[in-house]
Amino acid sequence: MTLLDPLANALSHITNSERVGKKEVYIKPASKLIGEVLRVMQENGYIGEFEFIDDGRAGIYRVQLIGKINKAGAIKPRFPVKAKNYEYWEKRFLPAFEFGILIVSTSQGVMTHKEAREKGIGGRLIAYVY
């Protein structure tokens, strides 16, 4: 069976492994987008270290879990969002104000909705984590 959404699969794999209590998880196939999402999650303290392992195919990410994720998921369809509308999407996807992050793909790279709001740029919503 083919994998339709690698990002959604990776985030659900991380969430399920956190709930079971695992300390690390292997995510495959690896992609640049998944790597950028993992980088943003690491910068915000949701995961520990992660590394890319080349297996001769698409690659694998090894992610250290620290038990801080309640839920993580991909946002489909990837809604376009303007800089002034982040509050609406926060209310829709996050459980409380200033709790969790929305991950946004912008023209300046992948970042959280808070960074994008500070820079005054919009983009496309790709994931949420809390």
From Swiss-Prot:
The keyword Ribosomal protein applies. GO terms for molecular function: rRNA binding; structural constituent of ribosome. Keywords: Ribonucleoprotein, Ribosomal protein, RNA-binding, rRNA-binding. It comes from the Archaea. One of its GO terms (biological process) is translation. The keyword rRNA-binding applies. One of its GO terms (cellular component) is ribosome. Belongs to the universal ribosomal protein uS8 family. One of the primary rRNA binding proteins, it binds directly to 16S rRNA central domain where it helps coordinate assembly of the platform of the 30S subunit. Part of the 30S ribosomal subunit. This is Small ribosomal subunit protein uS8. It comes from Thermococcus gammatolerans (strain DSM 15229 / JCM 11827 / EJ3).
